[in-house]
C-alpha cells in the first residue's frame, strides 16, 4: 500500500489536539447518518446506540475485524473486537456537529465531528482533544484508517484492507512524527 499524501495526515493543532479533514460525497444528511445511526456507524467505526441529546449516552462496540475481509495480524489481535465503551454526548447539532467523550471515564478525551457543505461534497472535520502524547499517538493511525473506510462506503467502493492500511498509516505517521512537528505519529 502506498503511504498517505501529507495533506491527508492528521494535523497536531496543540500538544493535546489532532485534527483530520476529509471531503466526502454528500449530502450532509447522508454523512450525518453514518455518524449517528448504529448500523451505518458500525460499517466504518463502531456500532451502538446514541442518545440524540447533550448528556446522552453513546455505546460504542468496535468490531474492527469485520471492517474488511482481511485476516487480523497477530500484532492487532487485541484491537480486533469486540471492544465496548460507554461515552457521553457533549454536543449534538444535527446534521452539522456531534461530539462525545472518548476513552476512560476518569480522564476522557473528546471527539468532535463537524460537517459542512463544500461545493457538491461535504467537508468532515474530526478534532480529537484532551489527549496526552501517547493517546494522541495511539488514536491518529486509527482515525486515519477508519476515515478511509468511511470514505469508501460513502463512495460506494469496497473498503480498503483495514489491517494493511493501518500498518501502512502507522508507519507513515511514525516517520512523519520524526520529520515534521505539525503532524502526529501512531503506535
Q: Predicted segments — roles?
A:
Residues 81-89, 93, 169, 173, ...:
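Alpha-helix-centered segments that form part of catalytic cores
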Residues 28-29, 51-54, 90-95, 115-123, ...:
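A short, structured loop/turn motif at beta-sheet edges
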Residues 22, 48, 84-91, 110-117:
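Hydrophobic/aromatic beta-strand elements that line small-molecule binding cavities or substrate pockets
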Residues 1-53, 57, 185-187:
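Hydrophobic ligand-binding cavity/cleft-lining segments
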Residues 2-3, 129-184:
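A conserved amphipathic terminal alpha-helix motif
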Residues 38-82, 162-170:
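Short beta-edge strand/loop motif at the mouth of beta-sheet-based domains
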Residues 17, 99-152:
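Beta-strand/loop substructures that line and gate deep hydrophobic ligand-binding cavities in soluble
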Residues 53-57, 80-85, 93-95, 108-110:
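Short connector loops at helix/strand junctions that flank enzyme active sites
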Amino acid at each position: 500500500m502506498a503511504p498517505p499524501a501529507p495533506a491527508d495526515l492528521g494535523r497536531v493543532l496543540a500538544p493535546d489536539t489532532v485534527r483530520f479533514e476529509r471531503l466526502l460525497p454528500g449530502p450532509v444528511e447522508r454523512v450525518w447518518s453514518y455518524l449517528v445511526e448504529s448500523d451505518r456507524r458500525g460499517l466504518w467505526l463502531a456500532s451502538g446506540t446514541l442518545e440524540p441529546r447533550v448528556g446522552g449516552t453513546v455505546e460504542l462496540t468496535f468490531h474492527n475485524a469485520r471492517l474488511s475481509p482481511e485476516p487480523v495480524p497477530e500484532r492487532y489481535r487485541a484491537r480486533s473486537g469486540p471492544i465496548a465503551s460507554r461515552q457521553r454526548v457533549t454536543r449534538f447539532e444535527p446534521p452539522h456537529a456531534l461530539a462525545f467523550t472518548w476513552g476512560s471515564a476518569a480522564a476522557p478525551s473528546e471527539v468532535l465531528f463537524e460537517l459542512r457543505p463544500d461545493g457538491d461534497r461535504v467537508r468532515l472535520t474530526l478534532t480529537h482533544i484532551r489527549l496526552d502524547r501517547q493517546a494522541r499517538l495511539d488514536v491518529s493511525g486509527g482515525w486515519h484508517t477508519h476515515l478511509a473506510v468511511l470514505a469508501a462506503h460513502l463512495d460506494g467502493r469496497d473498503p480498503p484492507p483495514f489491517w494493511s492500511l493501518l500498518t501502512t498509516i502507522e508507519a507513515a505517521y511514525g516517520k512523519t512524527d520524526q520529520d515534521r512537528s505539525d503532524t502526529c505519529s501512531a503506535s
